[in-house]
Amino acid sequence: MAQLLSDIEINSQIGQLPDWSVVGQEIQMVRKFKDFIAAIDFVNKLVEPAEAAGHHPDIAISYNKVTITLTTHDAGGLTQKDFDLAQVISQLSRIWV
């Protein structure tokens, strides 16, 4: 099982991810796209990196707004896996916005 990060580690890493915020024991990113199709295209691009990492985000779609939430459920909070995948998602989101 992945090891939980300390508050100091979380604060350090979230500072390197300006698109993300800490919400309780999760990190979250919200992105708006030009329309529903662009939002769905972006979400579809997340499948491969999530599968490769063996770590899957919670995703909510509301028309052109996508909310992505990461936490490591089996560890009960935030681990390095969350921040690694957040970095990949941030890079992908810059292509689609």
Curated annotation (Swiss-Prot):
Enzyme class: lyase
Molecular function via GO: 4-alpha-hydroxytetrahydrobiopterin dehydratase activity
Keywords: Lyase
EC annotation from Swiss-Prot or TrEMBL: 4.2.1.96
GO BP terms, alphabetized: tetrahydrobiopterin biosynthetic process
Catalytic activity field: (4aS,6R)-4a-hydroxy-L-erythro-5,6,7,8-tetrahydrobiopterin = (6R)-L-erythro-6,7-dihydrobiopterin + H2O
Similarity comment text for this entry: Belongs to the pterin-4-alpha-carbinolamine dehydratase family.
UniProt cross-references to HAMAP family, sorted A to Z: Pterin_4_alpha (MF_00434)
Protein name according to UniProt: Putative pterin-4-alpha-carbinolamine dehydratase
Organism the protein comes from: Cyanothece sp. (strain PCC 7425 / ATCC 29141)
